[in-house]
Amino acid sequence: WKNIIASKSGAATITRFDATDYKCRIACEVKPADHEYGYDASLDVDHKIQRQVDPFIVFGISAASEALRDAGLDNMTEEERLRAGCSIGSGIGGLPGIESESLVLANKGPSRVSPHFVHGRLINLISGQVSIKYGLMGPNHAVVTACSTGAHSIGDAARMIAMDDADVMLAGGAE
């Protein structure tokens, strides 16, 4: 936030993959925890879960945790949790994990594919993991509508509240 206020750009040379053959080699990547402005996922997401799922799920859980804290809803009673749910999605989801496990399958065979392959890439895992972490027992919804996923998630959550399916809905998207 301080950098936004100071008009400081987060754009830099891509580090997460070899971009040599690409026309564009800059991006606004989320910096690791050891960076001056880095993101420390361990504040909100257990290390075991981080190892099992793609980064979009980790970002989604972290964002949801921050949203619940900011709204004062991170310690709801059981009765409140019965009518609280999630509507969180992703436009593409776990492509990095799908790519890496496809290479494992092709080069090393099926016995070497991670047992977390499927459940670590599914778009509904953000809502699922958030519901598990916070004990949310209301609607659990995952949207996949490309670039409009976050907006659709918010709209669907609003409709669920309007239709009295829930009192509280956590909504958004992660990529």
Name these PLM-found stretches.
Residues 1-92, 97-138, 159-162:
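Conserved "HGTGT" condensation-loop signature of ketosynthase/thiolase-family condensing enzymes
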Residues 15, 167-175:
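Acyl-CoA/ACP chain-elongation machinery
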Residues 90-92, 147, 175:
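Short, flexible active-site-adjacent loop segments at beta-strand->alpha-helix junctions, enriched
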Residues 156:
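Internal active-site segments that recognize and position negatively charged phosphoryl groups
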Residues 150:
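Short conserved active-site loop signatures built around small residues
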Residues 139-145:
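Short loop-beta-helix segment that forms the pyridoxal 5′-phosphate
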Residues 153:
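Active-site histidine-anchored catalytic micro-motif
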